[in-house]
């Protein structure tokens, strides 16, 4: 369900901060988008992805983070489920740029509406993961736009940023890379 408040009362925002409910809220050109808590399945898959990919990311010199703000300005930021960025993009408030963002889909979320924002920041890839069936979509930056990548002959997708090949099988999402693999 969507609701629109023309003006969000400061006391509502303060209460969300006090209760810790604002951690996933986003600001889109000065407009607050209050994101509901993720499901348990969503959280577990996000954690599994972070655990599986963090050692690889670190070896490649990339900083992995979970639910970290990606900022274009103080009143314009998104909170992807996972972010992989270079150390120089890490800031006190979150990240000021990224090489790869991962969005785990939830019913009615705004994942695809974020494509232009991420492209404007120069995000090289966006991986969209569907927790229910563990399928993935990959978008790659081409001429300032994040465009969908077609699956390879095996039906999988390969992230150039991390060098990870993603395929979906009956037993889950398979990730493989030079020297390792994981099934989630």
Language model regions located:
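C-terminal interaction segment
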Residues: 1-9, 14-18, 22, 33, ...
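Short, aliphatic-rich beta-strand segments
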Residues: 27-36
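A solvent-exposed, acidic/Ser-Thr-rich amphipathic alpha-helical stretch
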Residues: 41
């Amino acid at each position: 369900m969507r609701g629109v408040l023309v003006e969000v009362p400061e006391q509502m925002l303060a209460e969300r901060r006090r209760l810790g409910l604002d951690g996933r809220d986003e600001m889109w050109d000065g407009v607050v988008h209050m994101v509901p808590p993720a499901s348990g399945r969503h959280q577990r898959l996000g954690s599994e992805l972070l655990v599986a990919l963090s050692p690889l990311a670190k070896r490649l010199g990339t900083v992995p983070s979970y639910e970290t703000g990606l900022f274009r300005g103080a009143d314009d930021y998104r909170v992807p489920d996972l972010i992989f960025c270079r150390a120089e993009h890490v800031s006190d408030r979150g990240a000021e740029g990224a090489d790869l963002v991962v969005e785990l889909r939830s019913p009615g979320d705004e994942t695809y509406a974020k494509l232009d924002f991420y492209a404007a920041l120069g995000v090289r890839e966006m991986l969209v993961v569907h927790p229910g069936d563990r399928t993935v979509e990959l978008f790659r930056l081409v001429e300032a736009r994040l465009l969908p990548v077609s699956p390879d002959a095996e039906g999988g997708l390969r992230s150039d940023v991390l060098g990870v090949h993603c395929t979906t099988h009956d037993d889950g999402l398979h990730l493989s890379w030079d020297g390792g693999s994981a099934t989630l």
